[in-house]
Amino acid sequence: MDDWKPSPLIKPFGARKKRSWYLTWKYKLTNQRALRRFCQTGAVLFLLVTVIVNIKLILDTRRAISEANEDPEPEQDYDEALGRLESPRRRGSSPRRVLDVEVYSSRSKVYVAVDGTTVLEDEAREQGRGIHVIVLNQATGHVMAKRVFDTYSPHEDEAMVLFLNMVAPGRVLICTVKDEGSFHLKDTAKALLRSLGSQAGPALGWRDTWAFVGRKGGPVLGEKHSKSPALSSWGDPVLLKTDVPLSSAEEAECHWADTELNRRRRRFCSKVEGYGSVCSCKDPTPIEFSPDPLPDNKVLNVPVAVIAGNRPNYLYRMLRSLLSAQGVSPQMITVFIDGYYEEPMDVVALFGLRGIQHTPISIKNARVSQHYKASLTATFNLFPEAKFAVVLEEDLDIAVDFFSFLSQSIHLLEEDDSLYCISAWNDQGYEHTAEDPALLYRVETMPGLGWVLRKSLYKEELEPKWPTPEKLWDWDMWMRMPEQRRGRECIIPDVSRSYHFGIVGLNMNGYFHEAYFKKHKFNTVPGVQLRNVDSLKKEAYEVEIHRLLSEAEVLDHSKDPCEDSFLPDTEGHTYVAFIRMETDDDFATWTQLAKCLHIWDLDVRGNHRGLWRLFRKKNHFLVVGVPASPYSVKKPPSVTPIFLEPPPKEEGAPGAAEQT
């Protein structure tokens, strides 16, 4: 290393000197000052632009005021001022206002917009099929009614005809089809659409799309139609845009006398549509009823809970029949509405009744179940002294002697602990199987559809263990379970005092109603005196059943029970048939017999200890299950019980529908 010499080409190494702290801070401060100057310059420019813009606005405003002073207009009220703010198209030579209406029809979606506001939009899957109808007030343009009629299903076209016939003349009608609306659109409905001026509606075909706007009793304002090219496809979507001229308020109002009843009527009829003569200008139907008082009315102070949802037209029909029943106490009626819907409350207010709304809890059948629980709890809170409550649904017609029926039988609930309820509905009481309005039965099932509930039963047993919101159970099926019923029975009439008219609901459609509800017999005779009411008590009823069986004529069991000739062509006789029933839950033969008798066959209803009572050809007809029923002892030794083989079950067949 001693002989090493540095290269003369390389610069000698020297340690780098650090920049002094003074120079470092001077550099930083110089950069910050430059940034500050830039920001200040930008702010000055922004303020300058703002000042220029404001000066221009002030000058424009002064110029406009000066021009207005040179050509002054007369003073205008508020409505006229609003008119001046409308678009130039609406300020034409005609003083009437005009609505912009858009209507859309397609396979999967419908919508209606009025002046840019969407008043209907339905694109939910597997819902909203059929013809959607909207009614607008011809003077204000506000929506008075929205309905959808699933005219793919039976009888929905009848409901649509009824609704459209009840709409007042002059109203604006809007129709649009989602998915399919022609399958059950019968001639009567087509004729009505033709009378409204529609050309495409009466010719509506399978899966066609259609949009229509017109005035009832007036001109058609727009219509579009697209025909389906094949059975497997739909018509093209159609979008109808049209103008709807509005009429004066004078043309849209009725001039009734200024009374408290008519003030209620006026409020109602200015908001909603589809209620027919209640809003007639010339001869409106009454909204106050004066049925005859019921002598010795045992249910005068029993609260009545009407369970309702968003079916206001059903509620209107139901309340009319309820308020027309002899012995009704309007002050004891409370309508419980599941949700904050306006129109059902409007119906309640029309009749001057009490209405209570509450927030829905859960979904589907659990929501209905929670609504019942909330309503029953509220009923007994409103009337803490009440021992009973009458429970009704919004889709029931109420018989004229409904309260008379309850008044004559309600003491049984107090005196007989073996009873679960009193119901106005007979599950097997069809037009061809019910005959005697004075006759009562004991049955092991809880029919519902107009029934009396004992407060002690609800507060001590049912309320504490009512199904919770997460359980998607039907409340009535739960109440029929052995754990709740505990061997108790219900009293029912042979001829029902309620009629289930609703065809739209959670577990209801047109097909189901046609098969199981439409042909139920409904009492229309006032003042029926029930016969031998005390014989419905537990021990007395057994005596009555044994008496009937002892007097009954045994039918020829070699004949087919499904044939009309199985029962003789007589009247006023009592007959008995014995069917195979190996155990208490063996209902195979009964179910097949119920099918061929065209009565309720989806589960077992209306039985008492393995015995069913009904009428055939105006004869009292008893059916006894052998050997499960204790009444099997009445079977003659020579008689072989009837056995009907159930059909083989198809794989993947859907389960039975349930009544609600």
Swiss-Prot record:
Note on cofactor: The manganese ion interacts primarily with the substrate UDP-N-acetylglucosamine.
Every GG-type lectin domain range: 97-258
Membrane topology, from the record: Single-pass type II membrane protein
PTM annotation (Phosphoserine): residues: S7
Listed cofactors: Mn(2+)
Tissue specificity: Expressed at basal body and daughter centriole of photoreceptor cells (at protein level).
UniProt-annotated binding residues for Mn(2+): D395, H500
GO cellular component, one term: membrane
Feature: compositional bias, Acidic residues: 68-80
Gene3D superfamilies referenced in this protein's UniProt entry, alphabetically: Spore Coat Polysaccharide Biosynthesis Protein SpsA, Chain A (3.90.550.10)
Catalytic reactions on record: 3-O-(alpha-D-mannosyl)-L-threonyl-[protein] + UDP-N-acetyl-alpha-D-glucosamine = 3-O-(N-acetyl-beta-D-glucosaminyl-(1->2)-alpha-D-mannosyl)-L-threonyl-[protein] + UDP + H(+)
Any Pfam family matching the protein: GNT-I
Binding site for UDP-N-acetyl-alpha-D-glucosamine: I307, A308, G309, N310, R311, D338, H371, E394, D395, L506, N507
Biological or metabolic pathway of the protein: Protein modification; protein glycosylation
Segments in the Cytoplasmic topological domain: 1-37
Keyword annotations: Disulfide bond, Glycosyltransferase, Golgi apparatus, Lectin, Manganese, Membrane, Metal-binding, Phosphoprotein, Signal-anchor, Transferase, Transmembrane, Transmembrane helix
Sequence intervals crossing the membrane: 38-58
Segments on the Lumenal face: 59-660
Annotated a carbohydrate binding sites: R129, D179, R207
The keyword Transmembrane helix appears for this protein: yes
GO molecular function: acetylglucosaminyltransferase activity; beta-1,3-galactosyl-O-glycosyl-glycoprotein beta-1,3-N-acetylglucosaminyltransferase activity; carbohydrate binding; manganese ion binding
Assembly and binders: Interacts with DAG1 (via O-linked mannose moiety). Interacts (via transmembrane domain) with FKTN; the interaction is direct and is required for normal location in Golgi membranes.
Family note: Belongs to the glycosyltransferase 13 family.
Protein known as: Protein O-linked-mannose beta-1,2-N-acetylglucosaminyltransferase 1
